[in-house]
Amino acid sequence: MGKLRVVHYINQFFAGIGGEEKADIAPFVAEELPPISQNLDKLLGEDAEVVATVVCGDSFFGENLETAQATVLEMVKGASPDLFIAGPAFNAGRYGVAAGAITKAVQDTLGIPAVTGMYIENPGADMYKKSVYVMSTADSAAGMRKSLPALAKFALKYAKGEEIGSPAEEGYIERGIRVNGFKEDRGAKRAVAMLVKKLKGEEFVTEYPMPVFDNVVPGRAIVNMSKAKIAIVTSGGIVPKGNPDRIESSSASKYGKYDIDGVDDLTSEGWETAHGGHDPVYANEDADRVIPVDVLRDMEKEGVIGELHRYFYSTTGNGTAVLSSKQFAKEFTQELMAAGVDAVILTSTUGTCTRCGATMVKEIERSGIPVVHICTVTPIALTVGANRIVPAIAIPHPLGDPALSPAEEKALRRKIVEKSLKALETEIEEQTVFED
């Protein structure tokens, strides 16, 4: 038997093409193996070789899920591989979602062993860990020296049909699959030993972990929108010019509260984005492309809504820990309630930003305030647990399109906001994506 043929999937950054400015690049097969694929090839040793690297921009995949997946599948199929490896994606949200999606598609559609790797908090891990093997990695490429060898070793083992051990033994993220096994000591003895450790306050590991369900009951629909006070929250990092609170561009440790009393339009002279997870140009040109202050102010004057809340809350969601996202929302939700806010419009941009946003959505809705989540990567919002979801235009400009004239763009933004208000007026019992 000859070497196993391997196809490697990576994003534009690891292909050496560029960062966010190249995130919209369509899928293609690299003419030469990029350095990361060359390293993977060496790690696979004499048993396998990387015969092709498929590259796709993170934003392109996220904004064109079906098209991108179908195109990449054809490219993978054309290389006739025996094994498919995606990533590692670490904590890059869009990359993780793309890696998980295409790994599952290759496995299910082509019947080829497929493996990926990413950080446990990557939204792609939550979405695909039950469907495919996802090797647990560090949260950044600084962990490449450990993550890539582990991914290569496990992928080879899987492709050869060898017995796969537990997550703790192999290093993949728990899949929620229970497997019967044999132990030297009978169950009663193990149970007593576990109980004794628990009573002593010592660490112990359960043999039967229970699933954690964290869905939140949808907030009640708004009965009279013309009387409702609407607040804006965003994980898209919109801040006053100069970022006075010094909110980090990634892995935020704080959020900001900003006064928009008397503000009808978020101009480039007064507002910008602190977000480091996408090209900031579009948001810096017009921050209304991320939070629709201009449209909501018009609606307030027209009597469509009762009032736009004086303050909006903002953080940068990319790479931000789930626990931090929860804590942010828990804190400012108390202020929203005290101010008599009736509903919230929450906007997000990139992949981990959407995870952060959806996490905040749930925390706000625990108070009973209904929230609508406007985002581009809707599968992440669904996976995390947002209840009312409205699809956005694009990751760097969820509520705008720079290709349109200012008047056309504002009309497009208004259409999305109108759909969002309709979502808030609609009584739901389960997660709902409000499509056109």
From Swiss-Prot:
Binding partners and assembly: Heterohexamer of two alpha, two beta and two gamma subunits. Component of the glycine reductase complex, together with components A and C. PB is substrate specific.
Family that this chain belongs to: Belongs to the GrdB/GrdF/GrdH family.
EC identifiers of the protein: 1.21.4.2
A Pfam family assignment: GRDB
Name assigned to this protein: Glycine reductase complex component B subunit gamma
NCBIfam families linked to this entry: gly_red_sel_B, various_sel_PB
GO molecular function terms attached to this record: glycine reductase activity
Alphabetical keyword list: Oxidoreductase, Selenocysteine
Gene Ontology, cellular component aspect: glycine reductase complex
Function: In the first step of glycine reductase, the substrate is bound to component PB via a Schiff base intermediate. Then the PB-activated substrate is nucleophilically attacked by the selenol anion of component PA to transform it to a carboxymethylated selenoether and the respective amine. By action of component PC, acetyl phosphate is formed, leaving component PA in its oxidized state. Finally component PA becomes reduced by the thioredoxin system to start a new catalytic cycle of reductive deamination.
Species of origin: Peptoclostridium litorale
Reaction equations catalysed: acetyl phosphate + [thioredoxin]-disulfide + NH4(+) + H2O = [thioredoxin]-dithiol + glycine + phosphate + H(+)
Top-rank lineage group of the source organism: Bacteria
Active site (catalytic residues): U350
